[in-house]
A protein has these predicted regions:
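Active-site histidine-anchored catalytic micro-motif
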Residues: 9-11
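Internal alpha/beta core interface subdomains
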Residues: 1-2
């Protein structure tokens, strides 16, 4: 389950050939089908009913610094597009409060759809929308990014999101 979770069932750029081989071997030993097990695991892990905004944001949240900017990034992985869609409007006001409470310049929150390998990135803080527009060449901050951007193919905070944000913030 750790390999499946870390690699998003081999979809993440963090996945290595050794990860895949180990998972296949372990699944054979355990007598399970990887796809079925992964779906059950992701469904259980993305069950957000009854969780507060704080629990959702801080479930997988890390702080970073780049240039003179301190920022935080949270992430939720789900198979359920409807569940992710509902989070968008719910989380933005809380993210602004969390940004102030944490003393951060910006907060980004990745709503990652495992099936479509797409992230809807929410952002708050002065200049955050421009950073996303510049880092991922999406939208035009002059027409207002509206605090969200769709990032096809982006599923990894570590390998995809943080490097792009860091390069942009350090310019």
């Amino acid at each position: 389950s750790a390999i499946i979770s870390d690699t998003l069932l081999f979809r993440s750029p963090t996945c290595t050939p050794m990860d895949r081989a180990a998972a296949v071997s372990l699944a054979e030993m355990a007598g399970i089908k990887l796809d079925e097990f992964a779906n059950q695991m992701f469904e259980a892990g993305s069950e957000l009913k009854g969780k507060s905004d704080a629990e959702i944001l801080y479930l997988d949240f890390k702080k970073f610094s780049a240039g003179k900017t301190n920022f935080g990034v949270g992430q939720i992985n789900s198979l359920n597009a409807e569940e992710l869609g509902k989070l968008k409007n719910r989380m933005l006001p809380f993210m602004e409060k969390a940004r102030e409470d944490e003393g951060l310049d910006m907060i980004f929150f990745m709503l990652t759809n495992i099936l479509t390998e797409t992230t809807e990135l929410l952002c708050v803080g002065q200049g955050a929308a421009q950073v996303v527009a510049d880092a991922f060449h999406v939208g035009d901050a002059n027409e207002e990014l509206k605090q969200t951007a769709t990032l096809p193919g982006v599923v990894s905070r570590k390998k995809q999101l943080i490097p792009a944000l860091t390069v942009t913030l350090e310019q």
